[in-house]
Amino acid sequence: MESRKGIKEVSMNFLDQLDAIIQNKHMLEHPFYMKWSKGELTKEQLQAYAKDYYLHIKAFPKYLSAIHSRCDDLEARKLLLDNLMDEENGYPNHIDLWKQFVFALGVSSEELEAHEPSEAAKAKVATFMRWCTGDSLAAGVAALYSYESQIPCVAKEKIRGLIEYFGFSNPEDYAYFTEHEEADVRHAREEKALIEMLSRDDSDKVLEASREVTQSLYGFLDSFLEPATCCHCHKA
């Protein structure tokens, strides 16, 4: 009995550490999103962000596929598949919803597709992909959890800012955020359960994945507040 209690305490402590890492670099605390919440971003900054974020939006289903294809646990695969289907199934799917947001900012389809992603955007995607294709499935799921667990409150605040400060009135224009405000509550809950289910003496990798992902998210957002941001805005 004592042994089981000990195992549970270690597990809870491990998951608490994971959440602490995420909270320490929560995206809502980043100056870029704080400016978004206060209406202090320019339209050009939002356009640059929307175009550069597109690389991650397109890659997200691949992160899920990389983990799903290597997972032997049937129940875990079902949860991963549900998340993947949420991303890609139906019309509009999540990529389509992101495009609706981009177009509402005045960016054309041609401009979006021709955009050359920044080094920060590439680094973020590479970080996710490295963990999702690595030798620890739990660490791969932790990379996703470190992102998706933040999204519901981030999406809610983004919607408020878009309506209050940036003239968004058509719900279709911010439907991407509405969808994720709801769906990622479930995704994060399932991912946390998967981390505990799949973890095999690799808690250090799980925590390292979270540290690297949260740092890459901050690095990406940093790039829109630097003097070089204007380069994002004028790239094709």
Curated annotation (Swiss-Prot):
GO terms for molecular function: metal ion binding; oxidoreductase activity. Fe(2+) 1 binds at E87, H94, H180. CDD domains: TenA_PqqC. InterPro entries: Fol-rel_CADD, Haem_Oase-like_multi-hlx, PqqC-like, Thiaminase-2/PQQC. The keyword RNA-binding does not apply. The record marks Y33 as: Side-chain cleavage. Its cofactor is Fe(2+); Mn(2+). GO terms for biological process: small molecule metabolic process; sulfur compound metabolic process. Keywords: Iron, Metal-binding, Oxidoreductase. It is an enzyme of class 1 (oxidoreductase). Binds 2 divalent metal cations per subunit. The keyword Metal-binding applies. Its EC number is 1.3.3.-. Fe(2+) 2 binds at E87, E148, D184, H187. Homodimer. Belongs to the CADD family. Involved in de novo para-aminobenzoate (PABA) biosynthesis. Acts as a self-sacrificing or 'suicide' enzyme that utilizes its own active site tyrosine residue(s) as the substrate for PABA synthesis. The side chain of the tyrosine residue is released from the protein backbone via cleavage of the C(alpha)-C(beta) bond, leaving a glycine in place of the original tyrosine residue. Reaction requires O(2) and a reduced dimetal cofactor. This is 4-aminobenzoate synthase. It comes from Chlamydia muridarum (strain MoPn / Nigg).
